[in-house]
Amino acid sequence: MRTIAIGVAGLGRAFSLMAPTLAADPRVRLLAAADPRAEARAQFERDFAGRAYATVDQLCADRSVEVVYVATPHEFHAEHAQCAFAAGKHALVEKPMALSMAECRAMIDAARAAGRHLIVGHSHSYDAPVRRTRELIASGKYGRLRMITALNFTDFLYRPRRPEELDTARGGGTLYNQAPHHVDIVRLLAGARAVRVRAHTGAWDAARPTEGAYSALLAFDGGTFATLTYSGYAHFDSDEFTGWIGESGQEKDPNAYGATRTALAGDEMTLKNVRNYGGSQQPKTPTRLLHQNFGVLIASCEHADLRPLADGVWIYGDREKRVDPLAAPAVQRAEVIDELYAAVVDGRPPLHDGPWAAATMEVCFAMLRSAREQREIEL
């Protein structure tokens, strides 16, 4: 089996969450990384016996690297992806793809000019339960898809943040960090082009001056519509509705209420650094693996409501309720590697390519504009 050599641009929190997948999947090898923090570079060298560079330019110049995983701060995604393409590498880019449609188009053009793949992820539209829901919709067994309801209440805004993560202009807040998940999911389920959006946003804490909440109504060609609601204000936790299974498929303690806000009483940058790769607070290995989720999701067809959960898809039909079970994942987020490997090794076009991700960002930008201008936006 051919192994893909991966170089990581940015050893922050995104890499901490993706590292277990990259380390466990035999189809990929973590060969090199770039990060300005010496302690993170040293940790990478110890953990993976790889090469570590201080700059992304140096990483892209490494001829052994085939794919650059761009996990740098959002404002640098376009620059670093284009650096990878200029060096003849493929790029796997964390969401959000970029901070403007002009940047998205530049990334797509650079990938095409280089003859390399641009894949954007992880997003929760990769999740096996979401994809299985799409298969059930596409089967036609339950009639046409009419409505999608997506809701998620978390502590997102009160997790430790760098200053730019609380600045919308630099890619901070829920519209750049969380809405791409929601929009990707409903676009995948709808299987049609989004045509209109009307949104409202909330920024209710002056100490964290970015959008912490949003609600949007999204219309698709063919008449399907979706409602998206998200709050990151660390009050209600919608994992209560998913059996206390968290976003990463981990079992959660319902008695740990308020822990995120309480932790912020300390030094925020110290807390941020210990959560980054090389810090003392790394994602815990779950005692049992379950599929990831992004809150409550219900796809309403003419003859059934379909609800993906951590272990399968519940089908609420005209006369019966049953579950379509899914086997537990062997490796979390393996679906990302499936798509990357199929593209790079087998030459199969990826679903989450540049145009797909740009269409998702077009909706996210329109949500911001709709809330600002207080009107519906045509896409």
Located regions from the model:
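Predominantly a Rossmann-like dinucleotide-binding segment in NAD(P)-dependent oxidoreductases
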Residues: 117, 124-228, 232-249, 374
